[in-house]
Amino acid sequence: MKTEIAFWDTSAALPLCCSQTFTTQSKKWLRKYPKIVVWWGTSVEINRGLARLKRDGHLTEKETIKAARLWEKLKKTCRVVSPVERVLELANGLPENYGLRALDSFQLAAALVWCQEKPRRRPFITADERLAIAAEKAGFNEILLA
């Protein structure tokens, strides 16, 4: 059975919206895994990322608006993992167990909730090496954009 669904963390989703180092790779993986699962807080992280890229001079105002619109369109097709209590419970233990930062802990916890805590090598797409290692240790098939 072909798996067309994958969990995407923000570092993998942002390059789908604007030209970045991993845009080509992200688009390649989107063709393979067109059904995207994201954490509830991903939109905030995407908007923060776009604001940072604009502030740092990597995006113009026009490019930022276009990228934000693209994210809004893409977001409508995503399955979003809500901030349920179990996400918080899992996220609380992940920094110690996997050495993750707080927001990355929410990403991995959301992915675990998505699969009922049975990753079974489901795809987890990220450009963050530390998060990729943690996802693999948790049982996901980590796809590191590099």
What feature does the model see in each segment?
Residues 52-84:
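Helix-adjacent hinge/juxtasegments
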Residues 42-43, 73-98, 105-110:
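Acidic catalytic patch
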Residues 1-43, 53-66, 140:
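Short, well-structured N-terminal submotif of metal-dependent ribonuclease cores
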Residues 8, 38, 82, 102-105, ...:
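Short beta-strand scaffold positions
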Residues 1-5, 109, 113-146:
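Acidic, PIN/NYN-like endoribonuclease modules and their adjacent C-terminal/linker elements
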